[in-house]
Amino acid sequence: MARPPPPDTPARRRKQAAHARGLAAEDRAAAVLEAQSFRILARRLRTSAGELDLVARRDDLLVFCEVKLRRSLAEAAESLQLRQRRRIIAAAELFLADHPELAPLAMRFDAILLGRDGGAEHLEGAFELEG
Protein backbone atom coordinates (compact mmCIF):
# COMPACT_ATOMS: atom_id res chain seq x y z
CA MET A 1 0.00 0.00 0.00
CA ALA A 2 1.39 3.39 -1.02
CA ARG A 3 2.10 6.06 1.55
CA PRO A 4 0.13 9.27 1.30
CA PRO A 5 2.22 12.26 0.26
CA PRO A 6 3.61 14.37 3.10
CA PRO A 7 1.57 17.44 3.98
CA ASP A 8 2.37 20.67 2.19
CA THR A 9 3.87 22.80 4.94
CA PRO A 10 5.88 26.05 4.85
CA ALA A 11 8.99 24.11 5.92
CA ARG A 12 8.50 21.61 3.11
CA ARG A 13 8.03 24.40 0.56
CA ARG A 14 11.24 26.10 1.78
CA LYS A 15 13.13 22.82 1.45
CA GLN A 16 11.79 22.27 -2.07
CA ALA A 17 12.71 25.84 -3.06
CA ALA A 18 16.24 25.41 -1.67
CA HIS A 19 16.61 22.14 -3.58
CA ALA A 20 15.48 23.83 -6.81
CA ARG A 21 17.93 26.72 -6.24
CA GLY A 22 20.72 24.20 -5.67
CA LEU A 23 19.97 22.38 -8.91
CA ALA A 24 19.85 25.65 -10.83
CA ALA A 25 23.17 26.73 -9.27
CA GLU A 26 24.79 23.45 -10.28
CA ASP A 27 23.47 23.93 -13.83
CA ARG A 28 25.06 27.41 -13.91
CA ALA A 29 28.34 26.03 -12.56
CA ALA A 30 28.34 23.18 -15.07
CA ALA A 31 27.87 25.74 -17.86
CA VAL A 32 30.90 27.67 -16.56
CA LEU A 33 33.02 24.51 -16.74
CA GLU A 34 31.63 23.44 -20.12
CA ALA A 35 32.48 26.89 -21.52
CA GLN A 36 36.09 26.07 -20.56
CA SER A 37 35.92 22.77 -22.53
CA PHE A 38 35.35 20.56 -19.49
CA ARG A 39 33.15 17.50 -19.81
CA ILE A 40 30.91 16.86 -16.80
CA LEU A 41 31.40 13.29 -15.57
CA ALA A 42 29.13 13.41 -12.52
CA ARG A 43 26.70 15.71 -10.74
CA ARG A 44 25.58 15.51 -7.12
CA LEU A 45 27.50 12.31 -6.60
CA ARG A 46 26.79 10.91 -3.15
CA THR A 47 29.42 8.84 -1.38
CA SER A 48 29.69 7.57 2.17
CA ALA A 49 32.09 10.46 2.86
CA GLY A 50 29.92 13.21 1.41
CA GLU A 51 28.63 14.66 -1.83
CA LEU A 52 30.59 15.89 -4.83
CA ASP A 53 28.69 18.66 -6.60
CA LEU A 54 30.46 18.32 -9.96
CA VAL A 55 33.20 16.09 -11.31
CA ALA A 56 34.61 17.27 -14.63
CA ARG A 57 37.41 16.38 -17.00
CA ARG A 58 39.37 18.29 -19.61
CA ASP A 59 42.15 16.40 -21.32
CA ASP A 60 44.39 15.00 -18.54
CA LEU A 61 42.86 17.11 -15.75
CA LEU A 62 40.18 15.87 -13.36
CA VAL A 63 38.36 18.55 -11.36
CA PHE A 64 36.22 18.08 -8.28
CA CYS A 65 34.14 21.23 -8.06
CA GLU A 66 32.17 22.55 -5.11
CA VAL A 67 29.33 24.93 -5.98
CA LYS A 68 28.43 27.69 -3.53
CA LEU A 69 25.37 29.91 -4.00
CA ARG A 70 24.93 32.80 -1.60
CA ARG A 71 23.57 36.34 -1.65
CA SER A 72 26.98 37.61 -2.73
CA LEU A 73 30.23 36.19 -4.03
CA ALA A 74 31.94 37.24 -0.78
CA GLU A 75 29.46 35.21 1.29
CA ALA A 76 29.93 32.26 -1.07
CA ALA A 77 33.71 32.43 -0.65
CA GLU A 78 33.41 32.43 3.14
CA SER A 79 31.12 29.40 3.17
CA LEU A 80 33.71 26.76 2.16
CA GLN A 81 34.97 25.63 5.55
CA LEU A 82 37.83 23.25 6.44
CA ARG A 83 35.52 20.45 7.56
CA GLN A 84 33.64 20.55 4.25
CA ARG A 85 36.87 20.61 2.24
CA ARG A 86 37.99 17.48 4.08
CA ARG A 87 34.70 15.74 3.25
CA ILE A 88 35.07 16.69 -0.41
CA ILE A 89 38.60 15.30 -0.50
CA ALA A 90 37.44 12.05 1.14
CA ALA A 91 34.56 11.78 -1.34
CA ALA A 92 36.99 12.36 -4.22
CA GLU A 93 39.21 9.55 -2.95
CA LEU A 94 36.20 7.21 -2.92
CA PHE A 95 35.27 8.33 -6.44
CA LEU A 96 38.79 7.52 -7.64
CA ALA A 97 38.68 4.13 -5.93
CA ASP A 98 35.54 3.38 -7.98
CA HIS A 99 37.13 4.80 -11.17
CA PRO A 100 40.78 3.67 -11.11
CA GLU A 101 41.15 4.53 -14.80
CA LEU A 102 40.96 8.22 -13.80
CA ALA A 103 43.54 7.98 -11.00
CA PRO A 104 46.56 8.79 -13.25
CA LEU A 105 45.05 12.15 -14.23
CA ALA A 106 46.14 15.41 -12.65
CA MET A 107 43.60 16.36 -10.01
CA ARG A 108 42.35 19.73 -8.80
CA PHE A 109 39.77 20.96 -6.29
CA ASP A 110 37.88 23.98 -7.57
CA ALA A 111 34.98 26.05 -6.33
CA ILE A 112 32.46 27.97 -8.35
CA LEU A 113 31.00 30.81 -6.35
CA LEU A 114 27.62 32.11 -7.43
CA GLY A 115 25.87 35.21 -6.19
CA ARG A 116 22.11 35.51 -6.33
CA ASP A 117 22.73 38.73 -8.27
CA GLY A 118 23.99 36.59 -11.17
CA GLY A 119 27.71 36.95 -10.48
CA ALA A 120 29.96 33.92 -10.88
CA GLU A 121 33.59 33.25 -10.05
CA HIS A 122 35.56 30.08 -10.80
CA LEU A 123 38.29 29.52 -8.22
CA GLU A 124 40.75 27.08 -9.76
CA GLY A 125 42.64 25.16 -7.10
CA ALA A 126 40.40 26.57 -4.38
CA PHE A 127 41.94 24.14 -1.92
CA GLU A 128 44.56 21.40 -1.81
CA LEU A 129 44.70 17.79 -0.67
CA GLU A 130 46.25 18.88 2.63
CA GLY A 131 42.83 20.57 3.27
From Swiss-Prot:
- Coiled-coil intervals, chain numbering: none
Q: Write down a Pfam family by its short name.
A: UPF0102
Q: Which InterPro entries does the record associate with it? A: Restrct_endonuc-II-like (IPR011335), tRNA_endonuc-like_dom_sf (IPR011856), UPF0102_YraN-like (IPR003509)
Query: GO molecular function of the protein, one example?
Result: nucleic acid binding
Q: Which family does it belong to?
A: Belongs to the UPF0102 family.
Q: What is this protein called?
A: UPF0102 protein AZC_4471
Which species is this UniProt entry from?
Answer: Azorhizobium caulinodans (strain ATCC 43989 / DSM 5975 / JCM 20966 / LMG 6465 / NBRC 14845 / NCIMB 13405 / ORS 571)
